């Protein structure tokens, strides 16, 4: 939650002024605020949870607070030192040859005289092939082939599921679970009720006590399928509980192998926090080693070689984009914002983990820039700025004119221009992609976002703890999800006409749920540190206020249950087979939610970015794979 510094204020009268000030009122407010230079670091305060506070004194004597965040981990010299040879044409030519060979594998499954045709395993071959290219991160090359394969599988799907082949007498758990997951992810109407057929007479999922490798693989696919659950699907909840317990027990018995590593990865990250490029990197390490899951009629070596080449070719593009991003960061004046967290490389990493198609450079860079700005603003509203300054800044941003920054404190002048220039720049890129000017739309999102910050400012200054409903509605906006997603997705080569955009952005259910996950998950990771800084309002504290006698643990359980429900709702909004909006138009908003969720998986990974987040940067951006 972005809450405002309780440092001494130049004037408290500004707090109740309208944020839609006229130019005359804005100038009047300006006269109450002295122009400030950048602050100098002062005495260290008592540490609070994982992040301590530092008291600073600005040039005009105003006492301020700064979060004692660690500095940018990825300096310019390091980024410039990265080297790669995978941008050479020979690697791209080699990849193109392999793409052609993999297409032949797909096509031979569909030809009547193809050597891969087998009525006893033609269904599982197709599903396995689609699942493999997706997990290896190379599916973008085979969209037509994937559709053809899944159309074929779906034509044999029944209320009993599927067997290995079209002539299989009975359905089996492995084929049905993997088929359910894969078909559902592509928008086919498949019911989870098929899983009830794999329960015993007591209504429980049943497996043999021996836990063979084949059975473990089937239960692993059951677990993966259970994560693509929709609201109200009790059988999916039961499948998740059963399969998770089964796999955890299996890990205690089986030897260390590619299968055991795959189980650990899937149990660790699930689906909603298993980012596609991260999964590709992990799956490259285990693919082809597991003889139980490999298909002798499919050349896994060629699939693996292509996956490695594609990973490293994109790595060479990442290097160029990172060099550009670091130059932008320096040229924009961002390093002068010493009060904030600088996580532009980390945000770029998240973007490249969910959108690694070469043509989506604008999305990756736009997302990194926008999230960097949001984070600096969060720290400005949260700790460094006074209420008067922040109200002045918010009103000036609504005027959207560089002259409005003239009366701002010096540090805010720089911040104003970073926002102004970057939003305009991304809008220009969006206009090229969408064929229309989207600036007014973007400004509306930014205005509402900053208004939500000011609402939180009033709560903390007046000591008001809102109801859960008040906090939740405002908090979904102040989470920043909508602001972070809107402009970057409009730079993509995906049409977003107004009737589609309203189903993806505000006021859509998709947008609402994505914002909710970020707000709720962020609160569960940050509320203790926020409270130690005097920032009381969170979903946990507001829920406890509404329900006297509820313990903190009870409140956390309630919020975590809400998150699970919201995730299922978000799954439905993305994959609803009756939706008039294609999955391709919704997927990147959904994946942005996954990226933010990953950042809060273990802790506040945006404040403490030198542990899991650093590992993600190294594994998916810095280090290539070995061919």
UniProtKB/Swiss-Prot annotation:
Mg(2+) 1 binds at residues 378, 382. Residues 1-36 form a transit peptide. It catalyses: (2E)-geranyl diphosphate = (1S,5S)-beta-pinene + diphosphate; (2E)-geranyl diphosphate = (1S,5S)-alpha-pinene + diphosphate. Mg(2+) 3 binds at residue 530. Its EC number is 4.2.3.119, 4.2.3.120. One of its GO terms (cellular component) is chloroplast. It is an enzyme of class 4 (lyase). Its cofactor is Mg(2+); Mn(2+). It comes from the Eukaryota. It is found in: Plastid, Chloroplast. InterPro entries: Isoprenoid_synthase_dom_sf, Terpene_cyclase-like_1_C, Terpene_cyclase_plant_C1, Terpene_synth_N, Terpene_synth_N_sf, Terpene_synthase-like, Terpene_synthase_metal-bd, Terpenoid_cyclase/PrenylTrfase. Binds 3 Mg(2+) or Mn(2+) ions per subunit. SUPFAM superfamilies: Terpenoid cyclases/Protein prenyltransferases, Terpenoid synthases. GO terms for biological process: alpha-pinene biosynthetic process; diterpenoid biosynthetic process; green leaf volatile biosynthetic process; monoterpenoid biosynthetic process. One of its GO terms (molecular function) is magnesium ion binding. A motif (DDXXD motif) lies at residues 378-382. Pathway: Terpene metabolism; oleoresin biosynthesis. Its main location: plastid. Keywords: Chloroplast, Lyase, Magnesium, Metal-binding, Plastid, Transit peptide. The Asp-Asp-Xaa-Xaa-Asp/Glu (DDXXD/E) motif is important for the catalytic activity, presumably through binding to Mg(2+). Terpene synthase (TPS) involved in the biosynthesis of monoterpene natural products included in conifer oleoresin secretions and volatile emissions; these compounds contribute to biotic and abiotic stress defense against herbivores and pathogens. Catalyzes the conversion of (2E)-geranyl diphosphate (GPP) to (1S,5S)-beta-pinene. Belongs to the terpene synthase family. Tpsd subfamily. This is (-)-alpha-pinene synthase 2, chloroplastic. It comes from Picea glauca (White spruce). The lineage of its organism: Eukaryota, Viridiplantae, Streptophyta, Embryophyta, Tracheophyta. The gene is TPS-Pin-2.
